[in-house]
Every structure is written in C-alpha cells, then in structure tokens.
A protein has these predicted regions:
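Non-catalytic structural scaffold of enzyme domains
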Residues: 1-153
C-alpha cells in the first residue's frame, strides 16, 4: 500500500533492514520515462497525505493531480478491483481518468495504488505509465541481485 508510507519514519525506526520507498522508486522511474509533468493516479488518502507531491516536487517536476471527483471515482474503481471486478467497465473508467490527466499536461503517469496494475497497463495509456508495484519490485530485485547498493535507512 502506497499510503503506508505516511508512517515511513516510524517503520524505519522500528526495523533494522533497509527501507525501500515505493514512492521514491515510482517517481524515479516516471522521471526517467518522460521529460515533462507527471500525472498521479491514486487514492484520496494517499493524495491527502502528500506523499507523491513532495517526491515529485523534489524531482523538480510539475504534478498533474486528479480532481476531487476523479479521486472519488478512482477510489470506487479500486474498490471494485479489490472485489474482483476486472471488467471492461473498470478499464473504461481508468482509461478516462488517465486520459484526463494527459489532456491536462501529464507526460507520464504514476499508478500509485497496488491494486491498479491488476487492470491498468501501458496499452491503455498514451504516455509512459509507471506502476508503483512494478517500480518497487524492480528496485527490490536489483538490490537482491546486488546490482545496486542497499539504501541507507
């Protein structure tokens, strides 16, 4: 869950292993995929916590945020995915929201919810799509294979 990163400091303090941030890895991958503004497809809770906004700002990129209505619709679609609904109707809803982000200037999109990749994929989006789960998995594998040094906690 991306929103769990709201407790990042507490998690890092409670464990002795390196902490890999799904937020940092997703933003790094999105930044590498396109030169312009980054669209954020997320839940209301994650958005209100400001987790991605801060990381995107640190990367010196503009954020294309969802409207309140889009956040609500995204949450409804995520709830449907959690209930096992991977229908064309859910796909259509996600396509519409991502297209709105593109129309407002997003040159890349971060799918910042671990349920989204169960339905949303690159073929559905006209700009580079970074799935937060995939970004975290890629970094974890690179660290496990010692292709990159472990992060400092």
């Amino acid at each position: 869950c991306n929103t769990a990163h709201a407790w990042r400091d507490e998690i890092v303090a409670a464990v002795t292993i390196p902490f890999i941030s799904i937020i940092d890895e997703s933003v790094a991958q999105a930044v590498a995929s396109a030169d312009g503004a980054i669209g954020l497809l997320t839940t209301p809770g994650c958005f209100k916590a400001g987790l991605y906004q801060q990381a995107i700002d640190t990367a010196s990129r503009e954020l294309v945020a969802q409207t309140e209505a889009e956040l609500g619709e995204t949450m409804q679609l995520i709830d449907r995915i959690k209930a096992g609904d991977k229908s064309a109707d859910v796909e259509k809803g996600l396509r519409a929201i991502t297209q709105q982000l593109v129309e407002r200037g997003a040159t890349a999109i971060i799918a910042a919810c671990t349920e989204l990749p169960l339905v949303l994929n690159q073929t559905m989006v006209s700009v580079p799509l970074t799935g937060s789960t995939d970004a975290l998995a890629k970094k974890t594998v690179a660290l496990a294979l010692a292709e990159e040094p472990l992060p400092e906690s």
